[in-house]
Structures are given as structure tokens and as C-alpha cells.
Amino acid sequence: MQIFVKTLTGKTITLEVESSDTIDNVKAKIQDKEGIPPDQQRLIFAGKQLEDGRTLADYNIQKESTLHLVLRLRGGMQIFVKTLTGKTITLEVESSDTIDNVKAKIQDKEGIPPDQQRLIFAGKQLEDGRTLADYNIQKESTLHLVLRLRGGMQIFVKTLTGKTITLEVESSDTIDNVKAKIQDKEGIPPDQQRLIFAGKQLEDGRTLADYNIQKESTLHLVLRLRGGF
């Protein structure tokens, strides 16, 4: 069948393809016609960036569909994600991609829902709203993918301003760990945080399980006064 590829300059390229062709194949055909290396090509259809290993049929691209070709920003790069089984996944990313974006790409490739993914880099768990640049993750960096234990859960932390923060935690996390997660999200040093649950102030060395804090529990965050004791 024929499909069309429209570039940002407005030029339209016509390609002969099969439904079973992969996005890699299509990029190779574009290289043949236009001389643009595949690693500089990003193909968009129906608002979605197309992943190399998938086929046209996977994206329901039919005859006379129009794809959009965007040249990859210089910030484009490959990173690797290693699973506990030892498998390594290669992802095409931008420095400005959020951890959410990366988890979505992993879902596209591996079928693992984002809420079951924990990504680790340099020993640190990566928070969804942050970007690769925030963590200084550069080209060919390797992230580690850990599947979230069944003990993994969300809890909420409500501040005196009324803002509610959502945290991903394990029952075995200590109050110290929780304060560190709050610092990552909100920038509040742990020594200025007091956490309250069921009217009780939580002690740093104890775990969430110790206080019977379960999924979707709400903690209250009170800022410690300077000089307070």
C-alpha cells in the first residue's frame, strides 16, 4: 500500500509499504529517499510517537495514512533499562522526558503497567514527575527496573496549606524514608518535617507497618518551627 510522510518543511514523501513493515523499515525507506539517518527520525501518527520495533498494523496505519516526520532534537539519546531477569531494553528518549514518559515507553515495549514499575538510577528511586535531566541521566546511562512489590502502595500527605502530596511507599519504609520522599517532591528538609497520623507524631526509625499505615492512608505534615523542640 502507499502511505504519505509529511515533513516540517511541508514536503510530502510517498512510500510503498506493507502493513507488516516495522517502523524501523519505514525509517530505512525514508533514508533511501531523503538521506536522513533513521536515528534522527521521529515518526508521529495520531499524535503518538511511533516505536521502532512496532509494525504499521500495530498502530492501525492504513493505506494513504499520513505520518509526520520530525527530526530528532540534539537532546535525543538512547538509554538502557535492565530488568531483574537480566534483560536489557533500549529506549529512545529526550533529556526533557519525565519518568512518567519513560515508564510509558517501557509499557509500550514490554507491556508492564507504569504503576508496577520502579526505576532506579545511581541507587535512587526515580520520582514520576521529575525529568531525566533532573537526575543527570545521560546518553547510554543504565536504569534498573524493579517490579513493585505487592506491598507497594500509595499514601497521601496533607500539608497545613491544604495541599495533598501523593507518595509511592512500601509498608516496610521507615518514617525517615517517607520524609526523604517528601523532600524529593517538595524540597522540605526532613529535620523540618513532623508527620502526624491518627493524632500521633511518627518517630523516624519506625516503619509505616509499625503504625498500621495502609494504602491510601493520609498523614498530616506539620513544619517544625525553627528553634522548636
Swiss-Prot record:
Cross-link (Glycyl lysine isopeptide (Gly-Lys) (interchain with K-? in acceptor proteins)): 76
Family matches, as Pfam families: ubiquitin
Localization: Cytoplasm; Nucleus
PROSITE patterns the UniProt entry points to: UBIQUITIN_1, UBIQUITIN_2
A biological-process GO annotation: ubiquitin-dependent protein catabolic process
Propeptide section residues: 229
Domain Ubiquitin-like: 1-76, 77-152, 153-228
Keywords from the named record: Cytoplasm, Isopeptide bond, Nucleus, Repeat, Ubl conjugation pathway
Keyword Protein transport attached: no
Domain of life (superkingdom): Eukaryota
Coarse class of the protein's main subcellular location: cytoplasm
Entry's Gene Ontology cellular component terms: cytosol; nucleus
UniProt KW Nucleus keyword: yes
GO molecular function: mRNA binding
Family named by the database record: Belongs to the ubiquitin family.
PANTHER family linked: UBIQUITIN
Function noted in UniProt: Ubiquitin exists either covalently attached to another protein, or free (unanchored). When covalently bound, it is conjugated to target proteins via an isopeptide bond either as a monomer (monoubiquitin), a polymer linked via different Lys residues of the ubiquitin (polyubiquitin chains) or a linear polymer linked via the initiator Met of the ubiquitin (linear polyubiquitin chains).
Other facts noted in the record for this chain: Ubiquitin is encoded by 16 different genes. Ubiquitin is generally synthesized as a polyubiquitin precursor with tandem head to tail repeats. Often, there is one to three additional amino acids after the last repeat, removed in the mature protein. Alternatively, ubiquitin extension protein is synthesized as a single copy of ubiquitin fused to a ribosomal protein (either eL40 or eS31) or to a ubiquitin-related protein (either RUB1 or RUB2). Following translation, extension protein is cleaved from ubiquitin. For the sake of clarity sequence features are annotated only for the first chain, and are not repeated for each of the following chains.
Protein name in the entry: Polyubiquitin 11
Gene giving rise to this polypeptide: UBQ11
